[in-house]
Structure formats: C-alpha cells, structure tokens
Regions:
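Oxyanion-hole/transition-state-stabilizing segment in secreted/luminal serine hydrolases
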Residues: 1-40, 60, 64-68
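Catalytic His-Asp segment of secreted/periplasmic serine-dependent ester chemistry enzymes
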Residues: 66-152
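Amphipathic, non-transmembrane alpha-helical secondary structure
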Residues: 2-4, 37-44, 48, 126, ...
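N-terminal cationic-hydrophobic initiation segments that often serve targeting/anchoring roles
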Residues: 6, 47, 51, 84-87
Length: 152
C-alpha cells in the first residue's frame, strides 16, 4: 500500500506504527509463522519506505504487544529485541509500553484483551491511548484535554 500511493499527498508530523503481530500467527495446517528476523526485516522496510515518502514526519515504532505465554510470545520478544535498532533518535523512535499490558507477575493482563488474547479491548485501547498522550506532547503535538474523557 505504501508503495502504491497510500502516503501520497499527506505530511503528518508524527506517524505511529505497531506492526508485525499478524506475521506471528501460526496456522499449522496452512503455513508456519514468519521467523523473527524476517518480521524485523519487513518492519525495517516499512519504516524506511515511510522515511523516504514522509521526509518531514517523525516515526514512532511501538514494540509488538505481548501475547499469552507460548511460542508466539517468544517470537514477539525476539522481534521486540531487534526493534531498538530502527531508532535514530532524530526521526525514528522506538517505544516499548508492553509493561502496561502485563500483570505484576509479568503475565498477560487478560482484562485488557479480547477473548482471542491478541486484540485489545476497549480498556486496552484506553491504556494505549493514555500512554500515547505524553508521547504526543513530547513530539510537540497538542493533545485535546478532553480526549479519552479525562482531564490532564
């Protein structure tokens, strides 16, 4: 999509990305999951394409959100360990807020996810949005004080 015009005629101040999670899906009957280094290579390619097509934009890459314990979560952690390499501190930044989605014991906080334990539910999205408010301010963007129904 990016190469086919999805970013034409726009110039956002900030682009946020949380990508790669769908590449971790495993359907043993159809196909194996992508390897972490291949997922990272895909994320890097998308970030580089966005840098080229949006030369005035800053890009924030979020770590892939945690999963329930198991092989997929091990792959999430492997990809996330590579993501800081993308940050240059000028235009591309890496942000890891995964601790917000974990319990005190380091397990997935199921109350923030839908039944599939992959997609965030309303409370999970509110958690993410709340974490984004200081990030937006840090990058010089104004935040609606009534956003999320909360006052600053």
């Amino acid at each position: 999509r990016i190469r086919n015009g999805a970013l034409e005629e726009i110039s956002p101040k900030l682009v946020t990305m949380m990508i790669g999670t769908n590449n971790l899906h495993e359907d043993k009957k159809a196909y194996p999951p992508d390897r972490p280094e291949n997922i990272f290579a895909g994320i890097r390619a998308i970030v580089n394409e966005a840098r080229t097509r949006l030369p005035k934009s800053r890009i924030v890459v979020f770590s892939i959100f945690p999963r329930k314990a198991g092989p997929a979560y091990e792959r999430v952690k492997a990809v996330n360990a590579l993501l800081p390499q993308l940050a240059d501190g000028k235009r591309v930044f890496h942000v890891d807020i995964n601790s917000l989605f974990l319990s005190d014991k380091g397990l997935l906080n199921k109350s923030l996810f839908d039944r599939d334990l992959l997609h965030l539910n309303k409370q999970g999205y509110l958690t993410w949005a709340t974490a984004m408010k200081p990030l937006l301010k840090k990058h010089g963007l104004r935040v609606n004080p009534n956003a999320l129904g909360q006052k600053d």
